[in-house]
A protein has these predicted regions:
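Short alpha-helix boundary/capping and kink motifs at helix termini
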Residues: 2-133
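Charge-rich, solvent-exposed alpha-helical interaction surfaces
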Residues: 24, 31, 109, 228, ...
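A short, basic-hydrophobic beta/loop patch
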Residues: 119-173
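Charged, amphipathic alpha-helical linkers/stalks
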Residues: 163-209
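Long, charge-rich alpha-helical interaction segments
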Residues: 197-200, 204-254
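Transmembrane alpha-helical hairpins and terminal membrane-anchor modules
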Residues: 273-332
Length: 332
């Protein structure tokens, strides 16, 4: 094992506002873990996380729920050794809480967590450096333990992960309070803020601005964008952690709007949401045809003329459906 007692603690290098918001989220995670496995505590966690589980959730799951585009640029760097302040780590108390450790084992465990380092299979943290937050991939339980005993640092392997600059992100406030809050990256990619109040606290501390859709130039129709997001159920928990599974590309919306605006030719049978009522139409056509045939056998000029007229009407009705054309937008 490596001795790290002479190493300086990892410096987060973020603004005071971001550091405060990051620490607040980590504090919340500690409290949330205490609800895990509870009779109503676990269902409460499941509802808040938008999924279902049987224990405390991993730190990256919480961060991914609160922060949009979290892994958009996750170019993980080489791992390095560091002493990490547990107040800025999202851990998980999955198998127990700090007070479950026997009192006689506490000093030895504190010394081991604080001063020695094994392999990354034992303790590995991902550092979202621009946000000042670390998530525990391995070594999750020691976060709450070291915090409970007021310890300043955990010896850990750390991998630095990137995050888009604040200038590239815009939070979009809804005009209707019943609509979802959105986050947009590079004026092209959109995600739903499923926990908007928590997300706003973090993103505004990071430096992200809040705007409304109508104030953004060269954007597709907001209703069309929200419809596309609802069709893909982007307001629900995604099936994977891939950013593509929770992101709408506005270029796709632009392309679809262009295609929908193209003029197309339709017959009467192509009218959407309508079914041709053929019985009445067919009855009139058949009636004209039958009467015309009957009148054609009557040897009287006026009757023959009437029969020819009805025959013409029947023929026109028969051909009319195939000749009628409607020109309009592909979609209204």
């Amino acid at each position: 094992m490596d001795d790290l007692q002479d190493m300086a603690p990892l410096q987060l290098g973020v603004s005071p506002a971001m550091e405060h918001a990051a620490a607040a989220l980590c504090n919340l995670k500690i409290e949330m873990d205490r609800y895990a496995r509870g009779f109503i505590g676990q269902p409460y966690l499941d509802d808040w996380m938008g999924t279902h589980g049987t224990c405390a959730y991993w730190g990256d799951e919480l961060l991914r729920l609160a922060v949009p585009f979290l892994d958009w640029e996750r170019g993980v760097g080489e791992r390095f050794k560091a002493l990490v302040d547990p107040r800025h780590v999202l851990g998980a108390s999955i198998k127990g809480l700090p007070e479950h450790i026997p009192e006689k084992d506490v000093p030895e465990r504190i010394a081991r967590y604080a001063k020695t380092l094994g392999s990354s299979d034992h303790v590995l943290y991902f550092w979202y450096k621009p946000l000042g937050i670390l998530t525990a991939h391995e070594g999750k339980h020691r976060v709450a333990f070291m915090r409970a005993h007021d310890q300043p640092a955990i010896a850990a392997w750390v991998c630095e992960a990137s995050y888009p600059a604040a200038e590239r992100i815009t939070v979009i406030a809804p005009n209707d309070e019943r609509d979802d809050w959105l986050a947009m990256l590079d004026e092209r990619y959109v995600q739903v803020l499923r926990r908007p109040r928590v997300s706003l606290l973090l993103l505004q501390a990071y430096g992200v601005k809040v705007r409304r859709w109508r104030d953004l130039p060269d954007m597709p129709n907001e209703a069309r964008v929200r419809q596309a997001m609802n069709e893909r159920k982007l307001h629900r928990n995604p099936k994977t952690i891939a950013e593509a599974d929770r992101t709408l590309d506005l270029e796709v919306v632009h392309q679809r709007a262009h295609e929908d605006a193209e003029p197309v030719i339709r017959t009467i049978h192509d009218l959407e949401h309508h079914r041709f009522e053929w019985r009445r139409y067919g009855a009139v056509l058949a009636g004209c045809l039958v009467i015309a045939m009957i009148l054609s056998f009557v040897d009287y000029p006026l009757t023959r003329s009437a029969g020819m007229l009805l025959m013409g009407i029947a023929t026109g009705l028969a051909w009319g459906l195939s000749l009628i054309r409607f020109v309009g937008r592909r979609r209204s």
